[in-house]
């Protein structure tokens, strides 16, 4: 029997959360984990509650208008997985926690702000099964925000 390590375990949870996404363009999942390895919240990218999703509409404004990934976030009707998880957890459960993200290997400027403000300490990202694991810290994100 093989027991997977904590990082792989939490990335699998994030991967499962991504399967709830109702975004036609990308499926991203996030999980917030306390320092004692307890899951505090999960999130996935999708429309806010009671808003018709692009999946239900079978239409995505960003796809139809060839909007490049990483730009013009205000044109998207969805909430990012990271933001959704932070909202679900609340700041008290985010302090000194770790966030695991499945579905991309970068963090947009909007989510950098959320993560830094929430008190999350470390972040692990994995785009897909074949990509390398990316690790960063809130301090790294803070530095990026300072220098952008």
Show the residue positions of the predicted features.
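Zinc-dependent deaminase catalytic domain
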Residues: 1-148
């Amino acid at each position: 029997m093989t027991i997977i390590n904590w990082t792989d375990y939490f990335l699998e949870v994030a991967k499962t959360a991504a399967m709830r996404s109702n975004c036609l363009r990308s499926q991203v999942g996030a999980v917030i984990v306390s320092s004692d390895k307890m899951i505090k919240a999960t999130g996935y990218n999708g429309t806010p509650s009671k808003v018709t999703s692009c999946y239900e509409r079978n239409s995505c404004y960003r796809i139809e208008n060839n909007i490049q990934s990483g730009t013009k976030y205000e044109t998207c009707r969805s909430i990012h997985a990271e933001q959704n998880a932070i909202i679900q957890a609340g700041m008290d459960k985010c302090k000194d926690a770790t966030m695991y993200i499945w579905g991309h290997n970068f963090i947009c400027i909007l989510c950098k702000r959320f993560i830094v403000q929430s008190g999350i300490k470390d972040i692990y990202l994995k785009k897909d099964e074949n990509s390398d694991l990316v690790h960063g810290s809130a301090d790294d994100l803070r530095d990026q925000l300072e220098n952008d």
